[in-house]
A protein has these predicted regions:
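Flexible, gly/ser-rich surface segments that form the specificity/activation loops bordering the active-site cleft
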Residues: 86-145, 156-171
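Extracellular/periplasmic catalytic domains that process cell-envelope and extracellular macromolecules
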Residues: 33, 41-42, 74-76, 99-101, ...
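Terminal peptide-recognition signature
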Residues: 39, 46, 50, 81-83, ...
Length: 213
């Protein structure tokens, strides 16, 4: 009996790779089952624009205080997503008229519930370096509205996790800015008339909740 078991044990032992290489090691870390971010209300019909990566692989997408949202369109090149909620009242679409490309901007979003209680929006400052935002805002600001010092729409915030070895969330995110004209072009291409008049970003952002399997 020992002679038949021993080769099997040896074969299994030699097949074990404690530190995998290649595609097995290079795969992205698993996404959170529930992830929170921010969306910008862009039209009174319930249209909301956000970061496409935030809602990637979601089984259900919900807008806090309003209910479930439909995924209407995506732009994988710019990582933008268009959502829509129905029957919502009291929406305040943001004025998306662009600013003059200031290097210091305000990011208005709704932080992850682990960082704050409630759905209140908050604003943090960041500097624009090319397409990068420094420093990166807190988790939950993916999809946040970026406004320049004149109160003009500067673009949409994206958070991209750094893929390195180590515990989940051990490293800070990288933040990027999708410029205002790219956001407007995306909406126009999807027949959304962005005629918002609100200049108060805090009144025009909503919490986006993504639920994955």
């Amino acid at each position: 009996m020992e002679n038949t078991v021993e080769p099997v044990v040896i074969a299994m032992s030699s097949a074990f790779t404690p530190f995998p290489t290649g595609p097995q090691a290079a795969g992205p870390p698993p996404r959170k089952t529930v992830e929170y971010g921010t969306g910008i209300v862009v039209a009174e019909d319930g249209s909301i624009v956000t970061d496409r990566q935030l809602i990637d692989a979601c089984v259900t997408i919900a807008i806090a205080g309003f209910g479930n949202a439909d995924r209407i369109a995506e732009d994988r090149e710019r990582d933008l997503a268009l959502l829509r909620i129905y029957g919502a009242r009291g929406l305040k679409p943001l004025n998306l008229a662009g600013g003059s490309g200031k290097t210091t901007i305000d990011l208005t979003g709704i932080a992850d519930p682990q960082s704050q209680g409630g759905n209140a929006a908050s604003t943090v400052k960041a500097s624009v370096n090319g397409s990068d935002l420094v420093p990166a805002p807190a988790v939950g600001f993916s999809g946040a509205a970026a406004m320049d010092s004149d109160g003009k729409f500067a673009g949409l915030t994206q958070l991209k996790p750094v893929l390195v070895a180590g515990p989940t969330n051990a490293t800070p995110s990288q933040a990027a800015l999708v410029p205002a004209d790219a956001v407007r072009d995306f909406l126009k291409a999807n027949a959304v008339t962005a005629s918002g008049t609100s200049t108060d970003a805090k009144a025009s952002v909503v919490r986006v909740i993504c639920v994955r399997k």
